[in-house]
Structure formats: structure tokens, C-alpha cells
Amino acid sequence: MPLAVLPHYACIMPFAALLALLLLSFLTAAPAAAQQRETPYWATIRASELNMRVGPSAEFPISWVYRRPGLPLKVLRLREGWRLVEDPDGARGWVAARLLEDERSAVVTGDGLAPMRAESSAVSDLRWRLEPGVVGRLEGCEAGWCRIVVKGEYRGWVEASRLWGDKEP
């Protein structure tokens, strides 16, 4: 009985199909893994305009419009490309996940100006005074003080009690 001779590509085709399936499984697993992130966690507004909605879809009405890139939000729940978040004033609603980023930031709260100091001490040199509502990138916290950067150039230490977004969510 003669042996069947297969064309040279016959061995490659099953391998290519297996490789394609493997690649497809990785591509679909990444978004699923992102959906499984443990909540709560901090996120920052990436977009120049962000709509907060009453439900997890563009079909739901808008409850708030944010025009504050860098504003910290606490992510409370995940749902298919949407995040239930809480803002510094306690307002809650759903936002599109693609408009958020994982970079940590903090916003100045409380009454009056918050001193920004050169070091993490109340007797350290005063660098600037920050109004409530000023947003800065959070670089780290220690012993009741947080190092923040405002507008990419103003660096210093602010008492953690004057910030929202610095603590464990």
C-alpha cells in the first residue's frame, strides 16, 4: 500500500490554527482579568470631560459632568467596561472605565489654605499655600504627610488630613 504524501503546508496548518486559538484566548482573557480587579481602589479622571451616569451604560441619564482631569475617584464596583465611583464630595455614579487611569492623585479639602512644605514637617519651609479643590499627583505618604506634585512642577508635602484620595480606599 502506498504511503500518502502530504503537502508541506499540511503540518503547518494545524499548528497555525492552534497558535491563533491560543492568541485569541489571551486577548479575551485580559479584559476579563481587568474586570476582576479587587475593589475598592483609586483611579484618576483621564478625560477632559467625564460624564457620571445613574447606571452602567450610555443609555442612562447623566447625573454629573466632570471637567477636572486628574481628579481622584474611588472605584467601588466594576461592570462590563463601567465603574461605579465616588467623588470627593460623596456623589456616586457610573463612568466609562476607558476614561479613567490608575495614576494616584489627591485633592485638597477642608477650610482655608493648606500649607505645602519643603519637607514632611509642620516646621519645614513653606513653599506654597493650596486652595481647597487643588488637585495634585500623589507621590507617596508617610507619618501623616503626603508628597504631591501640582501642575507637574510644584512639589511639596501637605498634611494628609487636608487631602482626599491619599488613604487606603
What are these regions (language model features)?
Residues H8-Y9, L24, L50:
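Compositionally biased, low-complexity segments enriched in small residues
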